[in-house]
Structure formats: structure tokens, C-alpha cells
């Protein structure tokens, strides 16, 4: 006997419009807030610059790895451990190299170029960072706090006589202990805070 399915109701564009709260979140409306270890003594202006010059980031992925348990030719999936992806940001380089220099100093405090010594205590080289998803009125829809991040890769910046009409950019890969989400304060803010 065939299973009967109820036909879904007709969906109209006006129904869709009523469900798209606030006109939808825009991927170009965001701001990144960085912190650097006190030990590296960077100018406080660098943190403010980063709010403008970090041109790309990501809201974090959420992963729980499955555990496969075999049973008589079948595989039972059991929830395993939570894992956290590397968080990558893209930075526009200005002529004073202040943000790149801050990340280079941070990495050097972890493992010095000259002699491979560096900070032993994670509290000395890990900091929290935030990415804020903004609404079109400038209010914060939702924020993500990345706990205990530290850089593990600063990308190279290619130089060439043939490159014109371009500003240098570089990426930074940051390791993340875990993250939490913070509900925004605007009229369209959604979701619940989770940590």
C-alpha cells in the first residue's frame, strides 16, 4: 500500500516576503574585533584599524564528529566530540603594516624566529576575538565570540611589477578553543545566546 502525502500549500511571493525578517542578513555588514596579548605591546590604534581593515571573516561552522559503530553489516552513527575549525580573516594592508606587524609580533612571541623560544603558558598568548553581524541600520544582529584564539599562519603577499590597481591583502589563520554566540540588540536581532 502506497503512503499518502498531503500536498503542501501553495507558496506565494508575499508569503516568502513575510518570512524574510528584516530583508535578510547581509554578508558585507560585519565588523571584527581583535585583541592582542599585552606582552607584544601594540599601539591601541591597531585594534581600531582592524574594525575597518579586516575585509573578510566568517561566522563559525559547528561540527560534531560522528562515531561509527558497526553492527551486523550496518553502521550506527553516535554523536562524538565537538570540533572547531580554524578561523580565517582577510586583512587589507595599509602602508604602515600595523596589523600585519601586530600578528607577526604575536606569532614571534609564541615561537621566536631566531631561537624557537617563546611563551609556554597559553594564557600569555591566547586572546578572545569577536565577529559582529550588523543590520542595515548599524545595530548588531548577532555576535560570535571566539575564545582563546592565536595565529598559526599569516599568508604571504605576492609582489609583482605587473600588478596594478590593487591594494595588498593577507590572510591570518587563527586556532579556536571554542566559540559562543551572543544575541544582538537591534530590532531584528535573532537567535539566542549560546556558549
Feature-to-residue mapping (PLM):
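Glycine-rich, low-complexity intrinsically disordered segments
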Residues: 1-195
